[in-house]
Amino acid sequence: MKIGCVVLAAGNARRFGSNKLQVQVDGESLIRRALETVPSGLVTVVVSQYPEILSLAGEYGFEAVWNDQPDLGLSRSVRLGLEQLTDCGGVLFLVADQPWLKRDSVEALAALWAQHPAKIAAMAHGGVRGNPCLFPARFYPELLALNGDRGGSAVIRNHE
């Protein structure tokens, strides 16, 4: 089954004060670290309002999707990314500001999901569910209907 990936990289970083995805962690920008976690073989789109991030996405062979209205919140990026991947049986959502996330962890999540493709799979840390998460196609209508600063966690809560 074909799996797509949406890298969410359009946030305004209001509390941070600048584009935090360009901050260096161990000599590498947050965005580059995020793009390195994408498992090979996934159809991947990167959603951002930042031209430099969209350019970097192209260097990785990923599709760059311009978010021209980031103030509409996370739901706008979810929608823009998912609209490019509706032919996939599942879509993995990665947020770009998790510097310690490793590709092997994301690959393990995708492998787990492949064993139970009708269910949502999400990473957890310390017993708290978070990102990344992988949704089967049956949840696409709900994800596309999100609004404001709501993401996949709202859909997950609807199905607990």
For each predicted feature, which ranges?
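Catalytic-core segments of class I nucleotidyltransferases/pyrophosphorylases
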Residues: 125-160
